[in-house]
Amino acid sequence: LLARENFKRAGVDKLVTLIVGDAHEKVKMLKGPIDIVFIDADKDGYLDYLNKLLPLVRPGGLILAHNTTDVGSQMQDYLEAITTNPELETIFLHEQTTGIGVTLKKRLAK
């Protein structure tokens, strides 16, 4: 896989857990805490992934989602979820035409 090769070349292959397969099924098997999640899968499934992963992401953790600013996107429910949840803070990067959403799970106030 290209991702595995890139992680190795970057020297982080021992720090990254790469999960391959049906994401809707694989995500159910994950355990937290998770520091960073990168979602690049079926766009209709992003909200499902968020709902399953958010409880596992540690406070201060990041959720990166590919293609979040795609015009005519099928991800309106996901976008609404990450921009209206008070526990999250989201910015959008437009390095590519379809953008990447970067969502921070806020730390709990002490």
Put a short name on every predicted segment.
Residues L1-K110:
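S-adenosylmethionine/decaboxylated-SAM
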